[in-house]
Design a protein with these regions (language model features):
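A short glycine-rich beta-alpha junction/loop motif
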Residues: 3-7, 16, 36-37, 44, ...
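Non-catalytic DNA-recognition/assembly elements of restriction-modification systems
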Residues: 3-34, 140, 170, 178, ...
Length: 414
């Protein structure tokens, strides 16, 4: 049963006052070019180019060309480019990708006097009736699942996915009254601005942290109250390195039976969490703030914060001696471990040994107290970054909720 004031359409239930239009009715297809990355530069030129790879991984639903650094076409290749220069309100769709993200699009604004063309593996589109759409509406709607899910039956290819102009011609676009489009676009722009500003702040905090690490972990900057000479020392003077136990996969489960296992991949994500009901020795129990290091692939240390767990094979734990603040070691080891990883032979998977850790050379302060003071400063910055990241996740979820309500007309702003 459709609620009063709404109607059933080809793309689901929409408000009575919303129209629908097919892709073919909506757009004129513009020419694109086939220039590769090698034929572009960021130094300057006459004509700029929108590359499909940037649409897929970098550009938002609405691309402000006045603020985004677009690449230029190399001077010797300008003649190869199409002369289909873009205008504000044009939509660029990526027609090729490695998965179902194919079809991701961006609406361009802020072009001004710039000469900008659409590049390789794109479908540049111009609304036939520019007055039908408020700025940014198409950018937001075309990227929402109500539209994008219509592309899925038309995706072809196995290793590389693609869609064609002809195949998507019958896909359907919702057209609210223009004042409502404007109100929806404004609301989504506001949340996008908040998200972008948070991302910039996180980047700034990370840069501050990086600078602080370079100063504090080398002794170039000393904290008040500390003096004495820093010296290089092998880590075996400061830590023992415990390697995890080879728990039997016969006891592995994903239904929380027993204790969680810490496997190599768990240091980076929670995509696949396993538990084990196997009896264990307490020496392999991991607690929050333990410093763990993956021994296959990425060697970067992890400050464990996911509760009581069991240390599985090919994951190691730093066991500090009395003269070491283990949190300082977490920060101090990041650079030498990265260098060790990058210097490892080009095998399919890189491996770290128990001896590799103990032989690492680290510049150490003369006292444990100075180690702790440095670690506290860096930990505070990490906490700030973590809180900002949590806020970012929250606002991204808010945006998803707004889109699901506003782009379907379930909530009306006008």
């Amino acid at each position: 049963m459709v609620m009063p004031g709404y109607k059933q359409t080809e793309i689901g239930v929409l408000p009575d006052s919303w129209d629908t239009i097919t892709f073919e009715e909506c757009f004129t297809i513009l020419p694109n070019n086939t220039l590769s990355r090698a034929e572009l530069n960021y130094n300057g030129g006459e004509v700029q180019n929108i590359h499909y790879g940037d649409i897929l991984v970098k550009f938002p639903a609405v691309l402000d060309c006045s603020t985004e650094g677009l690449p230029y076409i190399n001077k010797e290749n300008v003649s190869k480019a199409s002369k289909g220069f873009l205008r504000d309100g044009d939509l660029i769709m990526a027609d090729t990708a490695e998965d179902v993200i194919v079809g991701k699009s961006t609406e361009v604004i802020g072009i001004g006097d710039s000469k900008i063309v659409s590049g390789l593996h794109t479908i540049p589109c111009r609304p036939r009736d520019a007055e039908m759409f408020a700025p940014k509406w198409l950018g937001y709607f075309i990227n929402y699942c109500t539209y994008h899910d219509q592309l899925i039956p038309y995706i072809t290819g196995i290793k590389v996915s693609s869609v064609s102009k002809s195949a998507i011609s019958s896909t359907v676009i919702a057209v609210p009254p223009k004042p409502e489009q404007e109100a929806i676009a404004e609301a989504l722009t506001d949340i996008d601005t908040l998200i972008v500003n948070l991302e910039k702040l996180i980047s700034k905090k990370r840069a501050i942290k990086q600078g602080a690490m370079q100063e504090l972990l080398t002794g170039r900057r000393r904290l008040p109250g500390f003096d004495g000479e820093w010296k290089e020392a092998a880590m075996d003077l400061y830590v023992d390195f415990q390697v995890g136990f080879p728990f039997s996969s016969a006891y592995f489960n994903s239904n929380s039976d027993g204790l969680r296992l810490v496997k190599n991949r768990d240091l980076k994500s929670d995509d696949q969490v396993y538990f084990t009901s196997e009896p264990y020795a307490t020496e392999y129990v991991v607690e929050n703030d333990d410093i763990l290091i993956g021994m296959d692939g990425d060697f970067l240390p992890c400050r464990w914060q996911k509760g009581k767990a069991l240390l599985n094979q090919r994951v190691g734990r730093l066991l500090p001696k009395k003269n070491l603040d283990v949190l300082f070691a977490y920060y101090a080891l990041q650079k030498p471990l990265a260098e060790l990883q990058n210097g490892t032979g080009a095998t399919t998977v890189k491996h770290l040994s128990h001896g590799d850790i103990k032989k690492l050379i680290v510049l150490m302060p003369p006292t444990k107290e100075e180690q702790s003071a440095i670690a506290e400063i860096l930990s505070d910055v990490d906490l700030e970054i973590e809180q900002l990241q949590l806020s970012l996740v929250k606002y991204m979820l808010v945006k998803q909720g707004m889109m699901s309500e506003l782009l379907t007309g379930r909530i009306r702003l006008v």
